[in-house]
Every structure is written in C-alpha cells, then in structure tokens.
C-alpha cells in the first residue's frame, strides 16, 4: 500500500473501532469505490496495536487499578469492586475467544460478503436504537454481575459477524441489561482490551510465520494514525452519548447500510 492508503485505512479503522458503527462496513467501502486491494496482515497488526494503545492510555487509571486489584484477588485473596469488575471482563471475553476459534473458517467463507455487512449494519443499528430507548439506564459497570457480563460477552461474540460492530453489540446488550450509557460504553471499551490484544498476538504470529516482507515505516504510520484516531474517538464518543444518546450513531448506521446496498445492487 502507498502512504495515502495507509493513512486513510488506518484513520477509518481508528475512528470506527470504538464507535458502534462497524469497522468492517467502512473498510469495504474503499475497495468498492476505489478498487483498493485487501490491506494485508501487517496492516491489520499495526492498526490493532494503535487501537490497543489508545484504549489502554485513555483508561490508564482504570486499567492499572483493575490489574492490581485482580492480582491482589489471586495472590492475597483480597476482594474489591475493581477485582470483581476485572473478573467480569475476563468472563465476558471467553465467548468471543471460544466461538472465534470454532467458527473462524465458516465466517471467512460464508459471512464476509458485502450483502451480509449491509444487512447487519442496518439490523444492529435498529437494535441499538431500541435498546437506547427502552433501557432503564440505572446501573454502573460495577453493578454488572457475572450473569450480565457473560451475556454481554455473548453479544461480543456476535460481532464476529462482519458489519455487526463489536462496540455496537456490547453496548446494545449492556443497555438492554440496564447499564447507563456511559457505563455501557466504558465496560465495552475495557472489554476490548483483551480481545484486541489477543487478536494482535495471533495476527503477529501468523505474519511472522508467513515470511512476508514487512514495511516497518508503513507499519509505524498505521500504528500512529490509528492511535490518534482511536484516542480522539473514545473521548468524543463518551461526550456525545452523555448529551445525545445513541441516536446519531443509529442514523449513521442506517444511512451507511443504505449506501452499501446501493453499491451492491448498482
């Protein structure tokens, strides 16, 4: 890829990774409109690293507190709200890990088409709207409990289907289960850390085993652009939902789904 493609695709990935609007739906548009080829494994690793650094840095205080409390619960038997939340996040990660390994090949073969992405973009946009309208919006992430955490984890596993949006599915589930908007978003973002880390490790392993020549300058650019875009996106998203709710993102998803359908049937 040339520098322009790296910047545009890393910007798209960084901006859409944490918004409930589906990164896969957006990454398909350049290929449809401009005829760009698949970005490749090295680029995927780079943007995942950039997104991971962004969410860890943004929630650095929470991450440190969760990690230290989790370790204290293991080695010292000390229980706290943070240790419970850390265990719930780990529990919520398991469905995506298990189903991801089990269904990876099937998803790659049958569910990566633009038609599937268009349908899921619209369908899960409507679910997000319904959840935002009907939610009690009373609970914080510290009141989630293991049952709700596991259900949110299964929602995260649904995001293995392209077009669903990991953050969209998890925030929708959290709202349905009674979390307030900010808590739903924070829980979703914290849940993303082990998932993105695991994906980056697996893709890095595949990359080095493939023996492909790595353009480290393009990789560094992809990391930097996706980091800045993702960090900015997290900050603005939390401000927007506290004032306007999920409606702007629902409208955007419906418009994007319509645009994808137009390209499919043109």
Curated annotation (Swiss-Prot):
Pfam families: BacA. Coiled coil: none annotated. It is an enzyme of class 3 (hydrolase). One of its GO terms (biological process) is regulation of cell shape. It is found in: Cell inner membrane. It catalyses: di-trans,octa-cis-undecaprenyl diphosphate + H2O = di-trans,octa-cis-undecaprenyl phosphate + phosphate + H(+). The chain crosses the membrane at residues 1-21, 39-59, 83-103, 111-131, 144-164, 183-203, 218-238, 246-266. It is a multi-pass membrane protein. InterPro entries: UppP. Its main location: membrane. Keywords: Antibiotic resistance, Cell inner membrane, Cell membrane, Cell shape, Cell wall biogenesis/degradation, Hydrolase, Membrane, Peptidoglycan synthesis, Transmembrane, Transmembrane helix. The keyword Transmembrane helix applies. One of its GO terms (cellular component) is plasma membrane. Its EC number is 3.6.1.27. GO terms for molecular function: undecaprenyl-diphosphatase activity. Bacitracin is thought to be involved in the inhibition of peptidoglycan synthesis by sequestering undecaprenyl diphosphate, thereby reducing the pool of lipid carrier available. Catalyzes the dephosphorylation of undecaprenyl diphosphate (UPP). Confers resistance to bacitracin. Belongs to the UppP family. This is Undecaprenyl-diphosphatase. It comes from Shewanella woodyi (strain ATCC 51908 / MS32). The gene is uppP.
